[in-house]
Regions:
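Short S/T/G/P-rich N-terminal loop/turn motif that feeds into the first structured element of a domain
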Residues: 2-67, 75-82, 109-110
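Interfacial aromatic-anchored transmembrane helix boundaries in multi-pass membrane proteins
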Residues: 101-103
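C-terminal structural segments of small proteins and small subunits
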Residues: 74-99
Length: 110
């Protein structure tokens, strides 16, 4: 058995979590999270690089919790970069300006 085994990555995962500002633009954190869920999930079938995408809205009352999480998959990091600049994604991403107080991101190969 060779110790020089090469691992083939089959997918690239992109995870993002947001904390929204209560009352920003006249909406609650829950309203922001639901808007984000609806509009990001609507990108499936519009942005061809997306292999899978789901947005979860937080149900935990812990003060350290984030309000929404995006779990998305792409063929590779290059595909994710194309997704980020796709006009439909850029339009949705503009919504986040001025409504977030925290954001965390993790990207990895599987």
């Amino acid at each position: 058995m060779s110790g020089n085994k090469q691992i083939k990555h089959i997918m690239f995962k992109h995870i993002v979590m947001w904390r929204f500002i209560e009352g920003a633009n006249g909406k609650s954190k829950q309203q922001h999270a639901l808007w984000v869920k609806e509009h990001l999930e609507a990108l499936v079938g519009v942005v061809p690089e997306i292999r899978s995408l789901e947005v979860g809205v937080n149900v935990c009352v812990a003060g350290t919790a984030y309000d929404a999480v995006l779990v998305s998959a792409f063929d590779d990091a290059d595909a994710m970069e194309r997704y980020k600049v796709h006009p439909a994604h850029v339009e949705v991403a503009a919504y986040f300006k001025g409504i977030t107080e925290g954001r965390a991101e993790a990207d990895y190969n599987i």
